[in-house]
Regions:
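Single conserved hydrophobic/aromatic residue that forms the stacking wall/gate
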Residues: 1-14, 294-295
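Intrinsic disorder/low-complexity detector
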Residues: 11, 20-22, 286
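Short linear Ser/Thr-Pro motifs
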Residues: 4, 120-121, 237
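P-loop/Walker A NTP-binding region and its immediately flanking N-terminal helices
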Residues: 15-196, 206
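Hydrophobic side-chain positions on well-ordered alpha-helices
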Residues: 1, 41, 54, 279-282
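A short glycine-leucine-enriched loop at secondary-structure breakpoints
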Residues: 4-8, 187, 266
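Extended, largely alpha-helical regulatory/partner-binding modules appended to the mid-to-C-terminal parts
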Residues: 108-112, 127-130, 143, 179, ...
């Protein structure tokens, strides 16, 4: 009995260790499939073309601001831009190599000359001043020191005033990248000192095509209607489409179907909607009431 208990404990421990390794190695789809180069960005052709053109011509302003609804690629584009600016290997400035120390350190979050700040949690003037105190110092190992402030609209009025002084006369070695979902809350004095890029909500077809690519690569089974439904529910956000897909994948048994998506989201089925429309067109009030009661 003692030996069997010991083996059982060993088995349980190995099972837990295996489970922990799986949890550590698994990446959610939105993170795993986040674009790492401009060519991987979907649905923002105008912005990508403008950024690549500025990089290739080596005509870079000292401040950029990316605006748009959630999940459209603001922070992702800012990170790609940061890699392109400081890449040491790429023959073409608009194509970060993803192999040099600068590119790799930005991707893994260890870059010294690239700071990413969540302005929503560090919105106070003292925190902003602390950040700006490092601006005059030259970069350690890269051509530029790059500051990415996400959700910049959350900064306090005092913080914006402090930032404005630096934006008026930025050092040659500094580039600011800002991202916001509410550009109307950013003071005009700050906006006027930035090159602005408004990212549009992604089209359903773009989201659908990207989902199809990802599902095929991930060996996820699906039907065509489920892709259309997921893409429509995402409301222009690729990240939301992938987050929703994760939920449906865990809910589905082997294959994502339109019916599974509707059940998970509490939506009326396509068949029910078609029946209701037919009843309305045919002026069949009795049938319409029956269908309404069934759905309720």
């Amino acid at each position: 009995r003692f030996e069997s208990r010991g083996l059982g404990d060993v088995y349980k421990r190995q099972l837990l260790q295996t489970s922990d390794r799986l949890l550590m190695t698994y990446q959610v789809l939105a993170r795993k499939w986040r674009p790492n180069t401009f060519d991987e960005v979907v649905g923002q052709d105008y912005v990508v073309k403008a950024l690549k053109g500025a990089l290739d011509l080596e005509k870079l302003p000292h401040a950029f601001i990316f605006s748009g609804t959630r999940g459209t690629g603001k922070t992702t584009l800012a990170r790609i831009l940061a890699k392109a600016i400081n890449c040491s290997n790429s023959k073409k400035k608009s194509q970060p190599c993803r192999k040099c120390d600068s590119c790799l350190s930005i991707e893994n979050g260890s870059a010294i000359d690239f700071q990413e700040v969540d302005a929503a949690s560090r919105r106070g003037v003292e925190e902003t001043k602390e950040l700006l105190d490092s601006v005059p110092y030259l970069p350690t190992s890269s051509p530029f020191k790059i500051y990415l402030l996400d959700e910049i609209h959350m900064l306090s009025k005092e913080s914006f005033n402090s930032l404005l002084k630096t934006l008026e006369e930025p050092p040659e070695h500094v580039v600011f990248l800002f991202a916001t979902t509410e550009i109307d809350k950013v003071p005009p004095t700050v906006l006027s000192r930035c090159v602005q890029f408004n990212l549009s909500a992604m089209k359903v077809d773009n989201i659908k095509n990207q989902l199809q690519l990802i599902f095929d690569e991930e060996k996820i089974k699906y039907d065509e209607n489920s892709l259309i439904k997921l893409s429509s529910l995402a409301r222009g956000s690729m990240r939301d489409a992938l987050t929703l897909s994760e939920k449906v994948i865990s809910f589905s048994e082997g294959k994502i179907t339109e019916k599974k998506v509707e059940e998970l989201m509490g939506l009326p089925s396509s068949e029910l909607i078609q029946s209701i429309l037919k009843s309305i067109i045919g002026r069949d009030s009795k049938k319409l009431i029956e269908l309404s009661l069934i759905h309720i």
